[in-house]
Amino acid sequence: MNLRPSHPHPARRGPRIAVLGSYGGFNIGDEAILTCVLSCLRARRPGAHLVVLSRNAEHTRAHHPDADEVVPWEGVSRNHVLDVLPGLDLLVLGGGGILYDGEARRYLRLVRAAQTRQVPTFAYAVGAGPLTDAEDRDAVRTVLAEMDDVVVRDEESRLVLEEVGLEREVAVTADPALLLAPEPFTEAMMRDEGIPSGARLVGMSVREPGRAAEKLDEGDYHALLADVADFLVRRLDARVVFLPMERHDVRHAHAVLSHMTAPDQGRILHGDYSPGQVLGFMRHLDVAVGMRLHFVIFAALTGVPVLPLPYSGKVFDFARRLGAPALVGVAREQAGLLLAEVDRLWDEYPQRRDGLRTRMGELCASAQETCERCGSLLDEIGAARGSGGAPAPDEGPSGDGPYRAEPRPLHA
């Protein structure tokens, strides 16, 4: 098996740091997180040898040139993965929502193996919950108690860890993807997607109903979101663009389109785009309505008025911190309330824009705190071992601080 990175780097003499998470191209949000974690580590330790433990090594090699080495950890022998641990100076767990039923124990098994080999471990703005399975709860309680530092991305996750019985300090910061830098999404790319120049655009993110619409069958759920899309088409004289954040979202986007009375006014992005390009695309939008957390984050980063449709605690928590309106859930009989909230979002945004921009600055600064805590731990590790590479100057992961775009002007 070829374990060489796609982008060979000169030998590095800094610390050897491994990053473990749900990486490998399955979800744009997770890929955005990995981009930001690697950028942080490279900014703090330019000479570090960065290893990514990936669920799809080929994808990670191709899309993350900051990684010096990529090692698969699914579908390979346990010994193959354990061979990565000797010589590590730090194992970074996360970020992202990886501590939940059925998955937590899989990640923490490797963290525990690192701990038994005296490798320092750091939880990088992870998300937790739901955690009801006894084996997962025990793994979270025991393994996180022995980590060198535990940082979660929201208050909901801290409360989940507290309920599980974790008795230690847990820092709350914000999602690492808040520090993502945009990449251009050009007019030529817009044409390739069949999106007309100069049109008002509404971005939508849909996924399986989950707890956001637990009383709806799938057909009613799709019909409700189609009502929202049709309303925005009429209200704003706009086109609707669906942004799949992972591949299963495409099916739900097609289903919503099929329920619309004006399906010709809807498009689904079909290209294979990097997280930075998706963030760049958001700058073309006039308003955004969606369920996926990182869709909501990207919209907020670009100053687009956004209505989160929460399906889990992480979206509720982000909407609360952003000060954005957020519905408890969606039900067919509440369609009128949902449409009224969308209408109010559009009308009131000019008055709310400055407050949202201030809150986003605070959230970006909070996300930066995770990077600083990781850098401090690397300082301690280097001091204890008498090396570890020189720290970089104090700067954001991309070298120029968090991205804060001016919003696209609202059309009259």
What are the roles of these predicted feature ranges?
Residues M1-A412:
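Active-site anion-handling motifs in enzyme catalytic cores
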